[in-house]
């Protein structure tokens, strides 16, 4: 090889070697059994999602919920005037580094305006959307305001009396509570849903008064029949629960199961219109309208001439115009059979206990 070509080859080898050690990284192929790869790469990620994001803990909150509410508590928003949501989001980033959009989404879900909880923790002002609407966008954080709702007094009671442990935040500069010292079983009152890696959690809410009565009854008598005081799940969007004692008792004992909920409706004779004013928690007004329109086009719902979403500030309302000669009761039975106006609500009471996921019955 000519001297010039040798020099060029050596230079190319030097550049290639430099590329392989950029910032101390060395390019190489490692042979590793797939079981070891899963153990050292996949499992840490999976556990991070389970423990730090998706599954609620025994106080009824996910880490993102707890960080937001504690930040608002530190901002003295438990009572007094509201502040801009953007201000709260910015302050929360000191504890939650996931970005402003994720934090604001969390605030929306916990808000009174959104309506996803029986007892919301955020007293909101402005457009926070609605849980029963798929397409209703909430306003940007710079336009809305919020403060803690009155029920949060029970979330933070005696938090400064060593009732819970405090841990470092992500950069070790601040402290945050590992749990909130709730004075009632919030895990059963606030609906919660999360999808992790290889597991999920779907906890339906229950009536606060019934939960407290049942808790007191269990303290007085450990053998108390829970179903006699905790009658059934209570859903924020209302609807009628199709009661089945055997199914509910199984859900209460095992923490798993499914029950059915259907919409509430009324008939307006003068207008020959069916009005839907409560729908199952698991669906949306848009999904219902889309399904009805699809069935009408396919010729499977010939009794209906039109459907409109007339939801306004007074509440949810879907108006269904009937053709003459069609009985509203029979039409509704058909709608329940063919559309999400009758839907299933799944239960999977998967909760983190000391960092370990565990499916628990209501008694536990």
PLM features: residue spans?
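Catalytic phosphate-handling regions of large nucleic-acid enzymes and associated NTPases
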Residues: 2-255, 317-319
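Charged, surface-exposed alpha-helical interface/stalk elements
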Residues: 226-246, 253-364
